[in-house]
Amino acid sequence: MFDFLIKYPISIFEIKEFLAAALNCPFDKILVVSSEENADPEIAAEEWDKLCCLCIGTEVEGDVAWLLNLYRIEATDDEIEKRIIAVSQTKQIACYVPNDNWNGYLLTGSSPTPIQVYEDEEVAGENKYIFTSAI
């Protein structure tokens, strides 16, 4: 599983386009469902094996519009991270991508180079993400 956040609201279709580009995966082999729909996604059992990505999206608050949980990807977390950053920068879709710094994320797609930011847990809450540029 790989999680990342999208800063501004975009549609499920746009999320699917973003993931197809980032994961080098056919558009029709990606299933994006909202967390509310996740209980019973409409897909035949034999189609599950053909998916190259299952994405569960949760609409959240604060500095972020979407929390995306990615499953069924045949790549390492490092590879996925690099691909998401590259497509975010190219398409200028602002994302928060977790990195190894304590509680740190890279804000990508909003400036020429990624910016190190940190989640402010004192202000954030369940399904609410707030970021700061300093610890």
Where are these predicted regions, by residue range?
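Short, extreme N-terminal segment that most often corresponds to the first beta-strand
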Residues: 1-28
